[in-house]
């Protein structure tokens, strides 16, 4: 199959592209510039220069494709720089769907996010809007909702690498966030980190499995972990002992209200809200359907952090 990827040069795409090639498919990448494809096997990929805001480049990228995968996602928006959830996570999907309709491409796979909802944060709302647009516009769609994703970053932003840099390697104690005024349950909210190798295989295998069409799948690791357990596992993976102290979420949100418009501030109010909501899955049906045995989140599976 010829598979066009929108956002294929990011972290998730950098793992999906070689998985596509290994499965005998031909990836076609929409690329802003050659540097964005660093580390990818570009000699085995077709390339189209342009951005998701360019309808001409989108049309060229999807023309003649058997399937399109949309992977663009951002963790924070900076409206003053023209970087918004609505534009990249919703309007970009709309523009890509329009290009697919014009080119007669009916197979569309979307990377959404676990926990999306119509009345949540701006991030969650834009992802939900994208899902609804895909369902309304594409006859053969599949949506994946991964939890937080871990794995070798390959020079890109990755969950555990960022936590190591911002928290584990910091001289400050690691924050165990808690709601309210008392530190009851500090750091107890749960996430279910999913391995990037499993996410990549889910996307690739779904392309040739008609039974995945018209369905939304959650992708989580096999065992939820508390925030405290996640930080402890990352610290152990890099042979560090880390002091951890309860931290009131209200204090961090107050600081974020002043500074989260600046890229140097480590977390936004919405990010903290979503983090403390937890991120686990109620449905693991994708794995048996696609023949995937999900990898656990352990010290051994985080050995790549030692290279950081």
Please place each PLM-identified region on the residue numbering:
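Conserved glycine-rich Rossmann-like NAD(P)H-binding loop of the short-chain dehydrogenase/reductase
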Residues: 25-32
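Alpha-helical membrane-targeting segments
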Residues: 161-192, 241-279
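Oxidoreductase cofactor-interface core, primarily capturing Rossmann-like NAD(P)-dependent enzymes
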Residues: 23, 118-232, 236
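Mid/C-terminal beta-alpha module of Rossmann-like enzyme folds, strongest
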Residues: 200-267, 281-308
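N-terminal Rossmann NAD(P)H-binding glycine-rich loop of SDR-like oxidoreductase domains
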Residues: 3-25
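Rossmann-fold NAD(P)-dependent oxidoreductase module
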Residues: 15-19, 99, 133, 233
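NAD(P)H-binding glycine-rich loop region in Rossmannoid oxidoreductase-like domains
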Residues: 35-95, 99-102, 114-119, 207
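Conserved Rossmann-fold NAD(P)-dependent oxidoreductase catalytic core, especially the SDR/UDP-sugar
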Residues: 26, 74, 82-149, 153
């Amino acid at each position: 199959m010829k598979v066009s990827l929108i956002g294929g040069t990011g972290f998730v795409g950098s793992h999906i592209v070689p998985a596509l090639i290994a499965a005998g498919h031909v990836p076609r990448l929409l690329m802003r510039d050659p540097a964005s494809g660093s580390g990818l096997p570009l000699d085995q990929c077709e390339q189209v220069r342009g951005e998701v805001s360019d309808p001409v480049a989108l049309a060229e990228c999807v023309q003649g494709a058997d399937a399109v995968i949309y992977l663009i996602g951002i963790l924070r928006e900076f409206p003053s720089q023209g970087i918004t959830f609505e534009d990249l996570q919703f309007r970009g999907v709309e523009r890509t769907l329009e290009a697919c309709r014009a080119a007669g491409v009916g197979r569309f796979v979307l990377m959404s996010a676990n926990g999306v909802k119509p009345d949540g944060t701006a991030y969650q709302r834009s992802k939900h809007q994208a899902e609804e647009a895909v369902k309304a516009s594409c006859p053969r769609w599949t949506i994946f909702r991964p939890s937080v994703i871990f794995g070798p970053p390959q020079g890109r932003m990755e969950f555990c690498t960022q936590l190591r840099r911002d928290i584990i390697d910091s001289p400050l104690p690691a924050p165990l966030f808690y709601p309210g005024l008392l530190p009851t349950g500090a750091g107890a909210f749960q996430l279910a980190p999913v391995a990037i190798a499993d996410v990549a295989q889910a996307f690739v295998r779904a392309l040739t499995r008609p039974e995945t069409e018209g369905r939304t799948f959650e992708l989580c690791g096999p065992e939820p972990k508390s925030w405290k357990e996640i930080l402890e596992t990352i610290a152990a993976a890099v042979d560090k002992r880390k002091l951890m102290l309860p931290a009131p979420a209200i204090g961090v949100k107050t600081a974020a209200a002043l500074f989260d418009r600046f890229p140097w501030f480590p977390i936004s109010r919405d990010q903290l809200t979503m983090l403390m909501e937890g991120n686990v899955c109620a449905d693991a049906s994708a794995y048996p359907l696609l023949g995937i045995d999900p990898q656990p989140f352990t010290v051994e599976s985080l050995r790549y952090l030692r290279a950081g």
